[in-house]
Amino acid sequence: MSRSGLPAVVIDNGTGYTKMGYAGNTEPQYIIPTAIATKGIAEDPRCRARRWWCPWAAGKNIADLDFFIGDEAYENSKVYQITMPVRHGQVENWTHMEQFWEHCIFKYLRCEPEDHHFLLTEPPLNAPENREYTAEIMFETFNVPGLYIAVQAVLALAASWTSKQVTEKTLTGTVIDSGDGVTHVIPVAEGYVIGSSIKHIPLAGRDITNFVLQLLRERNEKIPPAETLEVAKRIKETFSYVCPDIVKEFKKYDTEPDKWFKTYEGIESVGKKPYNVDVGYERFLGPEIFFNPEIFSSDFLTPLPKVVDETIQSCPIDTRRGLYKNIVLSGGSTMFKDFGKRLQRDIKRAVDYRIKRSEELSQGRIKSKAVDVKVISHHMQRFAVWFGGSMLASTPEFYKVCHTKQQYDEVGPSICRHNPVFGAMTM
């Protein structure tokens, strides 16, 4: 704990949801949509051009305080304009981001920021300027005593140590982080992200929801117009799973429809009338876009297992075995039943085929050692990034690597361009 004796605050701002809470806890205290509802007043063009926090907005008027975040933002969508301050993992509107953090700290966590160190997360390849903007808001607006900005992939690796599959605490591995808006495949070696090998996949939870909705509409399922997206999302989260073979799965449904088809029961939010939605092939076709993306999009056609294999193959050769041996899942869109099992099988097939071909081409002169492929699933997978941050921020070393307010005052925001890796975490 800090000198005040209070735990650090951990906030993970995702594209779809923000997770926040105090270090040392196993789950975030609050999980809210990363959305803000404002009166739609035009943003100062100087802010928009520089994507900078507005220091001249320090003297707030009533309009500056008239906003809602999270679920309350959607509840007030008829009167207020909803915007997403984070898109594809990156902060797009720093004015709204500052307002969002303000409510997170004072309304939800109900803490005095001057008394708590803060751990915030960032996506891979985040621009150093973004760290400066974050530091400026945290140190100047909220006057926090200490700040650490952690890479989400490293935190996800740390969270995987809770899995029974993990026999060795290591910060070397491949993180597949799939949330609501974006999916990243991130190789990490000894706590450092191999930036040149990161792969981005334009498919994530929101795309699965839209695909499920598309399939329901094609079958003319009667869903209240105002609730179509929410119903598709609930069907995805309740009934979807990953199948081992899509052709065999179709046959199962056609042979035994009573066994495999499900029914979603809902109540209209306006008329309060009950309604039913039949759920069929959507159960396995939704998550299947990760493994056969051509069924959903003609723009991106590379299956996730192939992307993971290509990512690891592009890394330095001495790191590859460690990256194959520790493939860690993170994010809500990796929570589908048998997701890890299917992914491990497909990656293993690709690796074994390459070894077999190399032996054939060398006419048996080269004998390769088998590569161990292991995909790690664990019970903290959905909140892996936040939980990893909670673990690290509860260690004494966290306070040693934090950038302090005193250092910020002496050096300026550039001090937060670099955040040291926790060296003693794996001990």
Curated annotation (Swiss-Prot):
UniProt superkingdom: Eukaryota
GO biological process: phagocytosis
Gene3D superfamilies in UniProt: 3.30.420.40, Actin, Chain A, domain 4
Gene name in the database record: ARP3
Record-annotated disulphide pairs: none
Predominant location: cytoplasm
Origin organism lineage: Eukaryota, Amoebozoa, Discosea, Longamoebia, Centramoebida
Function, in words: Functions as ATP-binding component of the Arp2/3 complex which is involved in regulation of actin polymerization and together with an activating nucleation-promoting factor (NPF) mediates the formation of branched actin networks. Seems to contact the pointed end of the daughter actin filament.
Similarity comment text for this entry: Belongs to the actin family. ARP3 subfamily.
Species of provenance: Acanthamoeba castellanii
The protein's name in its UniProt record: Actin-related protein 3
